[in-house]
């Protein structure tokens, strides 16, 4: 214990599993400081992949902006380019735009410690687009007589190369959300917290809440969702009020700065 105290008192920042812990402000940050790329550097599939992997973000605080290069990578894979073959200029332009902007997110942080009690609510938002599907979890608490909403965790996944319908991708997003909130409840050891899961897909909500002769694809995922969550906890949210829309479509780092991503939707802060 003595050694730990000495370390905390002598360093302003620590690295915890690749995440920066700012001790002065007790917040967590992601490292986005990369070596600069000059115009002489050849942009290849290997370089894009290695750069994307350098953003270690297990919480998902930067997930909307880190989705863009992942979608770009899938586009590169479809081209069947060699690892060290120079990429087309339109791909290079997209990558460099993201690379130059990602640096502005180095100051983004989330509180390390969240005040969780028996009155805390977990709100899960899920969504999908043609290129990806995603889920995110926000904790809603009353702190000093004020409503506090904070991002707990988020995850986005690139859609499979095999073409799937939007409703099926939305169902996969529901699986992501169910797994996320289930892991959070286990980590907190508070299984009785109120959980609400929000989707803007009426089709997937129908699959989850009703019983029918679904296809194997739908049936397997509905079964998992029902095992991890309560059916009555799933609710509809209009698309323009679904914060996961930002996560499933992705956005540039600059757009992300002006969004409500870390605060959650404004309506969630209204008194019940």
Question: Where are the regions a protein language model picked out?
Answer:
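RNase H catalytic domain
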Residues: 1, 176-234, 238-243
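Flexible, low-complexity interdomain linkers flanking nucleic-acid-processing modules
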Residues: 1-54, 223-242, 246-272
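C-terminal reverse transcriptase regions that engage the nucleic-acid substrate
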Residues: 6, 11-116, 121
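Beta-sheet entry/capping signal
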Residues: 13-14, 27, 54, 61-62, ...
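Acidic, metal-ligating active-site segments
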Residues: 16, 124-149
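Mobile genetic element proteins and their domesticated derivatives, centered on retroelements
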Residues: 18, 52, 56, 60, ...
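Flexible loop/turn segments at secondary-structure boundaries
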Residues: 65, 72-75, 131-134, 142-145, ...
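A short, polar/acidic, helix/strand-boundary loop motif
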Residues: 142-172, 176
């Amino acid at each position: 214990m003595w050694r730990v105290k000495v370390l905390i008192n002598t360093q302003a920042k620590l690295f915890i599993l690749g995440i920066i812990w700012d001790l002065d402000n007790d917040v967590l940050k992601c490292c986005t400081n990369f070596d600069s790329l000059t115009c002489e550097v050849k942009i290849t599939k290997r370089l894009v992949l290695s750069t994307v992997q350098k953003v270690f973000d297990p919480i998902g605080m930067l997930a909307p902006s880190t989705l863009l290069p992942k979608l770009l990578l899938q586009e590169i894979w479809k081209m069947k380019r060699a690892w060290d073959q120079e990429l087309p200029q339109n791909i290079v332009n997209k990558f460099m735009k993201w690379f130059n902007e990602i640096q502005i997110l180095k100051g983004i942080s989330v509180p390390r410690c969240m005040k969780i009690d028996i009155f805390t609510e977990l709100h899960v938002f899920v969504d999908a687009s043609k290129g990806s599907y995603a889920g995110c979890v926000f904790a809603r608490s009353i702190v000093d007589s004020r409503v506090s909403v904070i991002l707990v965790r988020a995850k986005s996944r690139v859609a499979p190369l095999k073409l799937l319908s939007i409703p099926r991708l939305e169902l996969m997003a529901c699986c992501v959300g169910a797994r996320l909130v289930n892991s959070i409840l286990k980590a907190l050891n508070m299984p009785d917290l109120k959980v609400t899961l929000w989707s803007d897909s009426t089709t997937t909500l129908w699959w989850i809440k009703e019983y029918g002769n679904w296809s194997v694809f739908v049936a397997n995922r509905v079964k998992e969702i029902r095992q991890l969550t309560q059916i009555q906890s799933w609710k509809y949210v209009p698309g323009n009020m679904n914060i996961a829309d930002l996560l499933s479509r992705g956005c540039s780092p600059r757009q992300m700065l002006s969004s409500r991503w870390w605060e959650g939707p404004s309506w969630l802060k209204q008194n019940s």
